[in-house]
Amino acid sequence: MLTGKSIYHVNQNLGKAFEPGQLNGYFNDMTQKVLMGDKNLDEKGIPFLEHSDGSHVQMPTMIFQYGLGAYDLWVIRKEIDYFNKAKRCADWAIDHQEDNGAWSVFFYIYPNAPYSAMPQGEAVSLLVRIYKETKDEKYLSAAEKAIKFMLTDVRDGGVCKCNDFELILLEYTHLPLVMNGWIFALFGLYDYFLLTGEYEEEFKESVNSLEKALVHFDCGYWSMYDEEGKIASPFYHNLHIAQMKALYMVTKKKIFNEYAERFERYQKNRLNELRAFAKKAMQKLTD
């Protein structure tokens, strides 16, 4: 899928109710996942992915993003049905969280590397919002377990690379570094800090590490999906722009705004877009 467009890849611009420094709307707009995705819900209202053979699988990332989109719709529209949708997703997160605090995301394709920092962060963002509204400690407890696992080094079975100089949050523990997954994980860390005041230094350390790594995600005319040269689809390029804007609003680091503006310039240049499309097509053929 060269254009990166599907019900699972709806545009995720800057969140419609996002406010930096406030545990309110989410950083990215996930609302279309709710508004367009109600046909793929089970009897409990939880999203599922349908395979070509008709079988269903429930993916943590899909569920957490659906919950965040529903929460945003509740913030915007004040319709309790949307809050209930978000809460059901948070309850699913608790019911399916493993003892180590993780959710197995890649169990079906990478059984030896099933964990990811990205859904850990997204789950935390959902759980702390539901905790804020309900004051039910089970949501905060699950979020704390998720953060602790997310900050466990990959050498110890976790999903980050950490040492005295950097803190990198890994979407894949066995594949090249992916930027969007790192940032989604960062968003969860920031949300947990907003609620509890904890892990501020870890957030700052990872932001600084990301700042140094940004050069690896810019090929000069388009953004890169990963640090080893896989070019971003239009969907991921647009997502990178929104994430850069959100990070700038949160951190006030000018470099994130500079990259947001740079990526937007790339996006508006038709020649750049065609060049990126051609390279993406070639990479798809050789994958």
Where are these regions (language model features)?
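Carbohydrate-binding/catalytic loop surfaces
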Residues: 19, 29-55, 101-122, 160-181, ...
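Hydrophobic, well-structured mid-protein blocks that either form specific transmembrane helices
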Residues: 130-180
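Extreme N-terminal leader/anchor segments
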Residues: 1-21
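Structural helix-adjacent loops and short alpha-helical linkers that scaffold large soluble proteins
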Residues: 73-87, 130-145, 190-204, 247-261
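Well-ordered alpha-helical segments within folded domains of soluble proteins
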Residues: 59-74, 115-132, 176-193, 233-249
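Long, hydrophobic/aromatic-enriched structural stretches that serve as scaffold segments
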Residues: 57-118
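Hydrophobic alpha-helical segments and helix pairs
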Residues: 94, 99-149
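Long, well-ordered core segments of solenoidal/helical folds
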Residues: 2, 19-53, 83-102, 140-162, ...
